[in-house]
Amino acid sequence: MKMRPRYSVIASAVSLGFVLSKSVMALDRPDTGSLNRELEQRQIQSEAKPSGELFNQTANSPYTAQYKQGLKFPLKQVQILDRNNQEVVTDELAHILKNYVGKEVSLSDLSNLANEISEFYRHNNYLVAKAILPPQEIEQGTVKILLLKGNVGEIRLQNHSALSNKFVSRLSNTTVNASEFILKDELEKFALTINDVPGVNAGLQLSAGKKVGEANLLIKINDAKRFSSYVSVDNQGNKYTGRYRLAAGTKVSNLNGWGDELKLDLMSSNQANLKNARIDYSSLIDGYSTRFGVTANYLDYKLGGNFKSLQSQGHSHTLGAYLLHPTIRTPNFRLSTKVSFNHQNLTDKQQAVYVKQKRKINSLTAGIDGSWNLIKDGTTYFSLSTLFGNLANQTSEKKQYTKEDFQPQSHFTVYNYRLSHEQILPKSFAFNIGINGQFADKTLESSQKMLLGGLSGVRGHQAGAASVDEGHLIQTEFKHYLPVFSQSVLVSSLFYDYGLGKYYKNSQFLEKGVKNSVKLQSVGAGLSLSDAGSYAINVSVAKPLDNNINNADKHQFWLSMIKTF
């Protein structure tokens, strides 16, 4: 008799769980995996554009203006001498010399010849190369031209920053100082990579060296803004954990003098149903600007809305490490390579039905990303990555209640791609188009799925809508830039988004009649008012053009405000 009430309570709990499950089965219940994915969308960094041309020196001969056509003579041979008056091989100049040798030439023609030789070497990576027609007596039709390719002279450093002199020396030794000559691509790479170092501004200055044909390099480095912070509010959260979110963060550069950077980000939703903390520390580790970093992330959540009765809550811990290398740095092309490892511990509970799930995920990701000034006034961005993962899955659910495809251990592979283009148009207009997507080799756990909805997806649908194993997104946007106030810019835009995907890679366990594919699309308009380094206010509204998500809102209104210090 005393046992009956206890069994009655258990039976009631099971019954409650069944009823709740039936009522919400059509909805995607957020968990630690999907909520982490939503935050990863928020953490996407702005894309870096190539800088454009750094050095554009043309070889203007000092003789051209003073030489007239004048007396001509037959040119039989041209001797090219280096700065030590040693004759150099001229095979690479044959296509230039053939236009002069064996013909009647004047001093003006010889000046043009020297100019062409200078231009040839400058276009072939010798930044300050100069061909000079020295004073000489021309005998038997032989003319001597002095070729100064631009040898590396003295490299001096004026460092008024927290960046270590030793690091700057190592970086110069792998670029400009690695060659006998001042090579354009190496000098550009040095200038670009040192200006990529957070917390510093760098400038380069070339001057004539002490010896003939030498060029000295002066490196000037000053501190930029080493400490920065921000506070932001937005309504981009999940409706089951709180739409409104408050975030704050800080960043400190050059703590150890090796271009290191420490970043801390904190976020909480309204009523604190979602809390997240993330820390990232990285430092340059060699003279090739390779960066090593470590990350840690903590998330805690509790669901409301339709899932409140389930008493759903959970938390996750993520630890990671990465290597980032600037593989290619030129004025018009950037390519970076990144390898990262992450270890995740995910825990989810539905306390009303006594269900607890634990997952451990180890993943290794290798990828590239970059940008290219391929078209005038336009920049193309791209990225490719492959993730290899291992999942260990535990659940307290009885076997008869678990999904048919549940596996305690599994391996998976995920492929991601992104391609976008930004084109500046006349009259302060611009057009953006982009496509990104994901492929998988099997059905994925929620932390690896692609989210089609949200501000980074189809903007007419809420954050977290349509979580798919494989999917593709197309976004187009037409913008107009208008300077306002003293330093602010008002950007107005019209956009269209389209997304499609498969909820599950392997659909063999789905019941008949359950649709495994989804297509979303929306149109909208937005306004953005910002002052770089000070504040940004973004407002947009989007309307779905589909009816493929149950209980979807008729429109989405997105708002974010950020203040930087």
Swiss-Prot record:
Gene Ontology cellular-component terms for this entry are: cell outer membrane; pore complex; type V protein secretion system complex
The domain comment in this protein's record states:
Probably a beta-barrel protein.
Query: Which classification does the entry list for the species?
Result: Bacteria, Pseudomonadati, Pseudomonadota, Gammaproteobacteria, Pasteurellales
Q: Which UniProt keywords apply?
A: Cell outer membrane, Ion transport, Membrane, Porin, Protein transport, Signal, Transmembrane, Transmembrane beta strand, Transport
Keyword RNA-binding annotated: no
Task: Report the residue ranges that make up the POTRA domain in this protein.
Answer: 73-150
- What InterPro entries does this protein map onto? Hemolysn_activator_HlyB_C (IPR005565), Polypept-transport_assoc_ShlB (IPR013686), POTRA (IPR034746), TPS_OM_transporter (IPR051544)
Q: Does the keyword Membrane apply?
A: yes
What is the official name of this protein in its record? Heme/hemopexin transporter protein HuxB
Q: Which domain of life is it from?
A: Bacteria
Q: What's one Pfam family the UniProt record gives for this protein?
A: POTRA_2
